[in-house]
């Protein structure tokens, strides 16, 4: 390491995920070990993702991190756990183009710069910490030449944010709670890839992009301490639902999938209500969206849309296919129209081709009106995001997408 001015960087993109069988409650707060298994769908990173650039240089005097342009402290135990675990697995790195060699032993004394950016609101119930920690671990593993598979890396990401372990894969992912005290068997595994059930379309109603009043971490702790329903859920309900959900996903059985997804979301929020003091993540708009979907499915005579809510008011709706998704978007925009000064481009994000197909000029077709009922459900929706099941994390080769300057390792 004779030349002291060099900077080596890696930029990665990692998706977020939405749980269809929920994780709520830890049996070990430090290692972040859950009280039950969970299953999630990974969202297309083109629509919802974290971008992270990690850099190493002998000129850096300490580890530093910038999140969405603001420097944040890395002193928290979750960041420290992830950094320690990755550093302990680092290997020799050689950049022949730049003539740089980093020996395995050098990683202990070299410092890192990390810049991370979410393309969606942080801490508003859209699993930003999941994508964030998954991206951090994935990018650092690439930078340090860590030779471990995604499941092994998921055990490290889990120590930053529980649901982060599920963002290291695309498609549908299961987080095994594991039984060992050290957490070595509490890892994520891919059930199916993103092509297995690619008919599905996901529409998210961002009801509020403000930070929530009760964080997931404190909410879970209070539920574990006070909710009898949570104990029953973890022991009796979830193990059965996990098996049923795996079967539904394998067989692309949308009827079973919808029943399980909606029931599990509702039970999770019932647990929050059963917590002392009760936790309210959903609001009136969330409840109106549930009513809309329930009425829609009854009117259709068969489940066409599943809904699920994480620890926040945002509704995640999963449509059986694109035709249903187009009709659903029409209905949602009829019920929750944008404010007069908001244009459609900033009101419907993600896969905007659905907006074109929805043909939003003119009157709503009567068939859709029948499915959603009267237009008395106006509520505060900030915007919608259209997405689909997506792939896992990738390294971005295009250096123009890096968040750090290649010469200085400081934010651009």
Curated annotation (Swiss-Prot):
Keywords, comma-separated and alphabetical: ATP-binding, Lipid biosynthesis, Lipid metabolism, Lyase, Nucleotide-binding, Peroxisome, Steroid biosynthesis, Steroid metabolism, Sterol biosynthesis, Sterol metabolism
Gene Ontology biological process: isopentenyl diphosphate biosynthetic process, mevalonate pathway; sterol biosynthetic process
InterPro entries attached to this UniProt entry: GHMP_kinase_C_sf (IPR036554), Mev_decarb (IPR005935), Mev_diP_decarb (IPR029765), MVD-like_N (IPR053859), Mvd1_C (IPR041431), Ribosomal_Su5_D2-typ_SF (IPR020568), Ribsml_uS5_D2-typ_fold_subgr (IPR014721)
GO cellular component: cytosol; peroxisome
A Pfam family: MDD_C
Annotated binding of (R)-5-diphosphomevalonate, by residue: 23-26, 78, 161-166, 217
Subcellular locations according to the entry: Peroxisome
Inactivation phenotype: Decreased contents of campesterol and sitosterol (by 50% and 30%, respectively, compared with wild type). Decreased emissions of beta-caryophyllene (by 35% compared with wild-type).
UniProt feature coiled coil, ranges: none
Reactions catalysed, as given in the entry: (R)-5-diphosphomevalonate + ATP = isopentenyl diphosphate + ADP + phosphate + CO2
Record motif Peroxisomal targeting signal PTS2, residues: 40-48
Keyword Lipid biosynthesis assigned: yes
Pathway linked to the protein: Isoprenoid biosynthesis; isopentenyl diphosphate biosynthesis via mevalonate pathway; isopentenyl diphosphate from (R)-mevalonate: step 3/3
Source domain of life: Eukaryota
Enzyme Commission number(s) of this protein: 4.1.1.33
GO molecular function: ATP binding; diphosphomevalonate decarboxylase activity; identical protein binding
Class of this enzyme: lyase
Function: Performs the first committed step in the biosynthesis of isoprene-containing compounds such as sterols and terpenoids. Is specific for (R)-5-diphosphomevalonate (MVAPP). The catalytic efficiency with (R)-5-phosphomevalonate (MVAP) as substrate is 10000-fold lower than for MVAPP. Can complement a yeast mutant defective in MVD activity.
Subunit structure comment from the entry: Homodimer.
Family: Belongs to the diphosphomevalonate decarboxylase family.
Name this polypeptide is given: Diphosphomevalonate decarboxylase MVD1, peroxisomal
């Amino acid at each position: 390491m004779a030349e002291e001015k060099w900077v080596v960087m890696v930029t990665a993109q990692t998706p977020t995920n939405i749980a269809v069988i929920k994780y709520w409650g830890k049996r070990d707060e430090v290692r972040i070990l859950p009280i039950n298994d969970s299953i999630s769908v990974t969202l297309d990173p083109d629509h919802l993702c974290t971008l992270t650039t990690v850099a190493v240089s002998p000129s850096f005097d300490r580890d530093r991190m910038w999140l969405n342009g603001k420097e944040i402290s890395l002193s928290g135990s979750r960041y420290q756990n992830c950094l320690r675990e990755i550093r302990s697995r680092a290997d020799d790195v050689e950049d022949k183009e730049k003539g740089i060699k980093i020996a395995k032993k050098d990683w202990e004394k070299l410092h890192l710069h990390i810049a991370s950016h979410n393309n969606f609101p942080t801490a508003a119930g859209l699993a930003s910490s999941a994508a964030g920690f998954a991206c951090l671990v994935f990018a650092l593993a690439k930078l340090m030449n860590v030779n471990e598979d995604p499941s092994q890396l998921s055990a490290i990401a889990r120590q930053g944010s529980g649901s982060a372990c599920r963002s290291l894969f695309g498609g549908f992912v299961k987080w095994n709670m594991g039984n060992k005290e050290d957490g070595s068997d509490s890892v994520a595994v891919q059930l199916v890839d993103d092509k297995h059930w690619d008919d599905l379309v996901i529409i998210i109603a961002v009801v509020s992009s403000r930070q929530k009043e009760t964080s997931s971490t404190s909410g879970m702790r209070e539920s574990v301490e006070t909710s009898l329903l949570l104990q029953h859920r973890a022991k009796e309900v979830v193990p059965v639902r996990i098996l049923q959900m795996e079967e539904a996903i394998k067989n692309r059985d949308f009827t079973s999938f919808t029943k399980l997804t909606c029931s599990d979301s509702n039970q999770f929020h019932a647990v929050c209500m059963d917590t002392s003091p009760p936790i309210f993540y959903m609001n009136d708009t969330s409840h109106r969206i549930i009513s809309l979907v329930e009425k829609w499915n009854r009117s259709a005579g068969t489940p066409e849309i599943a809904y699920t809510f994480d620890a926040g008011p945002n509704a995640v709706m999963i449509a059986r296919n694109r035709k249903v998704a187009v009709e659903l978007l029409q209905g949602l925009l009829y019920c929750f129209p944008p404010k007069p000064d908001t244009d459609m481009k900033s009101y419907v994000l993600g896969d905007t081709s659905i907006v074109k197909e929805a043909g939003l000029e003119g009157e709503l077709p009567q068939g859709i009106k029948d499915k959603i009922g009267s237009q008395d459900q106006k509520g505060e929706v900030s915007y919608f995001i259209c997405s689909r099941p997506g792939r896992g994390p990738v390294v971005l080769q295009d250096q123009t997408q890096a968040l750090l300057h290649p010469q200085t390792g400081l934010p651009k």
